[in-house]
Design a protein with these regions (language model features):
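Short charge-dense sequence patches
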Residues: 1-16, 42, 59-68, 89-100, ...
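Flexible, acidic/Gly-rich N-terminal and inter-domain linker regions that tether
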Residues: 1-79, 87
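Short low-complexity stretches enriched in small and charged residues
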Residues: 31-32, 45-47, 82-84, 134-137, ...
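Solvent-exposed, flexible loop/coil residues
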Residues: 41, 77, 83-85, 166, ...
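A broad, structure-centric signal for solvent-exposed, well-ordered loop/edge residues
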Residues: 44, 52, 82, 86-88, ...
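Canonical Radical SAM [4Fe-4S] cluster-binding loop centered on the CxxxCxxC motif
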Residues: 70-109
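Core AdoMet radical
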Residues: 96-200
Length: 200
């Protein structure tokens, strides 16, 4: 099975850039009126030619969002489980070179914080950690996710890159969603941003 990285590396970015920049107002209008958005139409909506259509883009986005999710707004609260990190990224407050006090919540801390969040009426929780497999990795998640799952109707997590089997295990532990943020997919820029990266 091809990974996301494999597929990403196969893309011809010079060709994509030329195609995006070559789109016209007519291409944008066609894309705005299309019922489906194939890649070529999406390129039109991302192109400089689309800059004069921001209001129409916003209206289309709102229609599609309401069609998909209805008229609901959900709020979540982040629970910072740990700011330990084994990486040194130029853009991140958790970066290992930052001289800050490090804290990893234990069972009592988590119980206290989650009770306070529930008292405020929130039912959707986003768990946040730095990237430190040894101290805030799967063993830590196995210990603490089941108790949190019992208290919240939605449990999501921003987490370091894991193996596919570990993502499946997080789901079994009660996680509804996982977010892994990649600040850039441009490999030359990534090297500049990630001074030390244990997942590269």
């Amino acid at each position: 099975m091809k990974t996301f990285s494999d597929r990403w590396r196969q893309l011809d970015w010079d060709d994509i850039r030329l195609r995006i920049n070559g789109k016209t107002a007519a291409d944008v209008e066609r894309a705005l009126n299309a019922s489906q958005l194939p890649r070529d139409d999406m390129m039109a909506l991302l192109s400089p030619a689309a800059s004069g259509y921001l209001e129409q883009l916003a209206q289309r986005a709102q229609r599609l969002t309401r069609q998909r999710f209805g008229n609901t707004v959900s709020f979540y609260v982040p629970l910072y489980l740990s700011n330990l990190c084994a990486n040194d990224c130029t853009y991140c407050g958790f970066s290992m070179s930052n001289r800050i006090k490090r804290k990893t919540l234990d069972e009592a801390d988590i119980a206290r914080e989650s009770a306070a969040i529930r008292e405020m009426g929130f039912e959707h929780l986003l768990l946040v950690t730095g990237e430190h497999q040894a101290k805030v990795g799967m063993d830590y998640f196995r210990r603490h996710l089941p108790a949190l799952r019992e208290q919240f109707s939605s449990l999501q997590m921003e987490v370091q890159p894991l193996a596919e089997t570990e993502y499946a295990e997080l789901k079994q532990l009660g996680l509804d969603g996982v977010m892994v943020y990649q600040e850039t997919y441009h490999e030359a820029r990534l090297v500049i941003c990630l001074l030390i990266n244990h997942h590269a």
